[in-house]
Curated annotation (Swiss-Prot):
One Pfam family linked to the record: Carboxyl_trans
Keywords attached to this entry: ATP-binding, Chloroplast, Fatty acid biosynthesis, Fatty acid metabolism, Lipid biosynthesis, Lipid metabolism, Metal-binding, Nucleotide-binding, Plastid, Transferase, Zinc, Zinc-finger
Entry keyword Iron: no
Domain spans labelled CoA carboxyltransferase N-terminal: 221-489
Gene: accD
Name by which UniProt lists this protein: Acetyl-coenzyme A carboxylase carboxyl transferase subunit beta, chloroplastic
GO-annotated biological processes: fatty acid biosynthetic process; malonyl-CoA biosynthetic process
Organism of origin: Dioscorea elephantipes
Free-text comment on the cofactor: Binds 1 zinc ion per subunit.
Cofactor(s) named in the record: Zn(2+)
Subunit and interaction comment: Acetyl-CoA carboxylase is a heterohexamer composed of biotin carboxyl carrier protein, biotin carboxylase and 2 subunits each of ACCase subunit alpha and ACCase plastid-coded subunit beta (accD).
Length: 489
């Protein structure tokens, strides 16, 4: 579904000739046919779909730009677009304040900016200002409603990397990725081109931009997928459980977000929140003292350590849960992490609660030396008493990455071991293995899917159904919701 038809409309003036594949060619705007979608039929003017192949050249921009629906689409929005060559740039609109900015140095973009400013200065916006959307609605609902109501065109409009006067195929260098709330769709039979002229002579232009610079500049708006490099709108990313909208890849998730989606509201009771490391071996690196580094991560993440532990309810079932956070020193396991997990398991043993530990760690924390390695044995000992002696139920959830001492200890000790899709799970990393053994590690040999077929753990469960899967597992092992226990008693 196209969202950018309005962007191309600003290109259509006496210096920017923009051709479309329309149903027929004619000399006046009034003759343009109505679209097939009844919602789009305007008794005054309407833009046709993209399906047919004849050409029509627009000579004025007022008709295109002063359609009343344009004010239902944009007010104050930033859009990031990327073409098939990987070049990206951003477009910022603020029509109320007469601001139009494009983050690129191309003279073509300067042409657009100049034209847009002159358009606003003509006072055209007053005519249709009352059609601006109501700001009481959320951005998401506004965009969704606009798309559903007005943009059911079959038109494929985009800006080419090489702008020429010839008609070319849509797939040959046109912008194919429009970063908004939905992915772009196009009709392969359509074609479009843009020709610019300066002082009577034609010339070609190419937009160039650095993806990394744009990602840094707009990272407060977008989250880039590690797998497909697609961009996800940050406001909606948490509600989608940090799953990429483009490819379904599971990105890293903070411990607080995991607790929020896993534990029932108003049931979370944290344990040992104030426990912090005292730098037992007085580790000092050339770059930064260990204590300063701990303080830095505490300010950055709002956590005291690389794990949150506590008691809560999962669909009404009381549980003890520990969630590691990779954002805090790579989720490394030091003395505090080991002590908090041990206390959690001991509490669950005394209260006969099921235990969940969500693993996301690079392994033992080197800044605490052998003391961090001892946490592996300590946790394993507490887990043995919990599982073998008390016959209670422990579920281990392996997320990306789970490596080192965590994999070698409590990560693989669960009665049921669950992995997330595409999770990186290993004891030693690929680089370490290759440098130590002088052997090449095949790509994908440390992914959850490969290890699942080798029998390393039980199911691979995506985040969306995970809470329901855990609830069924607990009930299967005799852990029932509190309200159900009361009814049976």
């Amino acid at each position: 579904m196209e969202k950018w038809w309005w962007f191309n409309s600003i290109l259509s003036n006496e210096r920017l000739e923009h051709r479309y594949g329309l149903s027929k060619s004619m000399d006046s705007v009034n003759g343009i046919e109505y679209t097939k979608d009844p919602i789009l039929n305007d008794t005054e003017k309407n833009i046709l779909g993209w399906s047919d192949s004849s050409n029509y050249s627009f000579s004025t921009v007022d008709y295109l730009f002063e359609i009343r629906n344009i004010w239902s689409l944009i007010s104050d929005d930033t859009f990031l677009v990327r073409d098939s060559n990987g070049d990206s740039y951003s477009v910022y609109f603020d029509i109320e304040n007469q601001i139009f900015e494009i983050d690129n140095n191309s003279s073509f973009l300067g042409e657009l900016e100049s034209f847009f400013s002159s358009y606003l200065n003509r006072g055209s916006k007053n005519k249709y200002y009352h059609y601006m959307y109501d700001t009481q609605f959320s951005w998401n609902n506004h965009i969704t409603n606009c798309i559903d109501s007005y943009l059911r065109f079959e038109i494929g409009i985009s800006i080419t990397s090489y702008i020429s006067g010839d008609i070319v195929n849509y797939s040959d260098g046109y912008i194919y990725s429009f970063i908004c709330t939905e992915s772009v769709s196009s009709n392969e039979s359509g074609s479009s081109s843009i020709r610019t002229s300066s002082n009577g002579s034609d010339f070609n232009m190419r937009e160039n931009s650095n993806d990394s610079d744009i990602n840094k500049k707009y990272r407060h708006l977008w989250v880039q997928c590690e797998n497909c490099y697609g961009l996800n709108y940050k406001k909606f990313f948490r509600s989608k459980m940090n799953i990429c909208e483009q490819c379904g890849y599971h990105l890293k998730m903070s411990s607080s977000d995991r607790i929020e989606v896993s534990i029932d509201p108003d049931t979370w009771d944290p344990m040992d929140e104030d426990m912090v490391s005292i730098d037992p071996i007085e580790f000092h690196s050339e770059e930064e003292p260990y204590r300063d580094r701990i303080d830095s991560y505490q300010r950055k993440t709002g956590l005291t350590e690389a794990i949150q532990t506590g008691i809560g309810q999962l669909n009404g079932i009381p549980i003890a849960i520990g969630v590691m956070d990779f954002q805090f020193m790579g989720g490394s396991m030091g003395s505090v992490v080991g002590e908090k997990i041990t206390r959690l398991i001991e509490y669950a043993t005394n209260e006969s609660l099921p235990v969940i530990i969500v693993c996301a760690s690079g392994g033992a924390r080197m800044q605490e030396g052998s003391l961090s390695l001892m946490q592996m044995a300590k946790i394993s000992s507490a887990s043995y008493n919990y599982q073998s002696n008390k016959k209670l139920f422990y579920v281990s959830i392996l997320t990306s990455p789970t490596t080192g001492g965590v994999t070698a200890s409590f990560g693989m000790l669960g009665d049921v071991i669950i992995a997330e899709p595409n999770a990186y799970i290993a004891f030693a990393g690929k680089r370490v293995i290759e440098q130590t053994l002088n052997k090449t590690v095949p790509d994908g040999s440390q992914s959850a899917e490969y290890l699942f077929h080798k029998g390393l753990f039980d199911p691979i469960v995506p985040r969306n159904p995970l809470k329901g899967v855990l609830s069924e597992l607990f009930q299967l092992h005799g852990f029932l919701p509190l309200n159900q226990n009361k009814k049976e008693n």
